[in-house]
């Protein structure tokens, strides 16, 4: 990003990695706060966060209000538990980096401590060429669109 801020509230939506073992794939996270791995914290816009939560409830979706971590890299293995112990429920790679007057987020857990993604998926064309990733590829093809659709439905209902 060029360092300039967006003029309004930006809504970050999409997939997240679950950090806590009690959060299955499909868990909706609508956080009050987001932080980066270096400790930079961002409080989410209260009005839009409330709108997203109300929308989730109207749709009959359960959600959690827990801190979201933004990381430069996939968080796997023992690092998941370490960040969970610090109070974070899920991790993405975008939200805390958004520069806007305000942000709000709706993220849906895809990978979990019980079902970690291979770091190969940071380069999907490379990951798909490795037979060890084919099982994950099929799982991702099924679950990623389903989870992304949940986030999209919440945003659509909040607008």
Task: Describe each model-derived feature in a short phrase.
Residues 1-159:
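Glycine-rich phosphate- or other oxyanion-binding loops that anchor nucleotides, phosphorylated ligands
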């Amino acid at each position: 990003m060029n360092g300039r801020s967006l003029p309004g509230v930006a809504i970050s939506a999409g997939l997240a990695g679950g950090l806590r073992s009690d959060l299955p794939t499909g868990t909706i996270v609508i956080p009050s706060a987001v932080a980066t791995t270096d400790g930079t914290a961002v409080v989410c816009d209260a009005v839009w966060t409330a709108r997203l939560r109300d929308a989730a409830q109207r749709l009959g979706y359960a959600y959690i209000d827990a801190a979201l971590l933004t990381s430069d890299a996939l968080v796997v293995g023992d690092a998941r538990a370490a960040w969970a112990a610090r109070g974070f429920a899920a991790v993405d790679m975008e939200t805390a980096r958004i520069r806007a007057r305000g942000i709000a987020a709706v993220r849906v857990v895809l990978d979990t401590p019980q079902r970690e993604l291979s770091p190969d998926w940071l380069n999907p064309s490379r990951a798909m060429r490795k037979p060890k990733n084919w099982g994950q590829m099929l799982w991702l093809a099924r679950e990623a669109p389903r989870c992304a659709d949940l986030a999209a439905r919440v945003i659509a209902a909040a607008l």
